[in-house]
Amino acid sequence: MYYNAWYWSGPMGSNRSRPSSTEGLSSLLIPTISAGFPSPAEDYIELGIDLNKYLIRNPISTFFLRVSGNSMNNAGIYNNDLLIIDRSINPHPGHVVVALLDGEFTLKRLIKKKDNYYLKADKENYPAINLYEYVDIQIWGVAIYSIHELKKQKV
């Protein structure tokens, strides 16, 4: 069974926000930065970047959510990250999704084993959630970006 009817049927709470086309998500852009050897080939600098253009494909269907918890750390999603969720993407196995299971939200990876669908944390010590064990299953959206602060490490 493949879930073709992905839908949302209610308010999500205060942890959700929708970007507007007027929000100031722009800044100075240096075209590239080398993490190895610098490139002398750069002969121009773009004056600005509109983060909406790069991060938001469908503004009407895009939301920001704040992550609480660490079960998705191996996917590069950490506690307090800001996720960009696109509800217009049809979820497939392998996607990180926001799911509503019997009224409770969760962020997990959608996987398929044989004919069953599961939601799985990207940490091994968390059990997979069998979607067939729930009455009300809604895949609310697909996580497309995770924004987090880079912390200083002791060296």
Feature map (PLM): residue ranges:
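Glycine- and charge-enriched low-complexity intrinsically disordered segments
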Residues: 112-155
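Short, positionally conserved secondary-structure boundary motifs
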Residues: 1-73, 138, 145-155
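Structural motif
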Residues: 80-81, 95
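Short, compositionally biased
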Residues: 93-107, 111-117
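Short coil-to-beta-strand transition motifs
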Residues: 79, 101-106, 137-138
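Hydrophobic beta-strand signal
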Residues: 84-85, 98
